[in-house]
Amino acid sequence: MTEAAAPTSLFIGGQWLSTPASFEVVDPSDYGVLAEVSDASVQDGLDAVTAAHDAFQTWSVTPARQRAEILRRAYEIMTAEAEVCARLIALENGKAWRDAMGET
């Protein structure tokens, strides 16, 4: 299999962020490197929690209908990209295609 295209940075507070540290994601079937991804620090984790808390302040007052529409759109995107997600799962975990599709 060829390398799957996927973001390799952290997504915190609505922004893609690179980190000074990274690690390799390895295909367990042949130990080939699939990607090199950003390695989050403790501070990155704290920043993500803060960003999520801040976003909740807005999300919690967003009308239910609008929240439902956003979640529905997220579902539609995830469904449309199910094969891409399954491919990443199969590559990273060495899962059979059927099992990987079952997780999407």
Protein language model features and the residues they cover:
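Terminal low-complexity tails and localization/encapsulation signals of metabolic enzymes
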Residues: 1-36, 69, 73
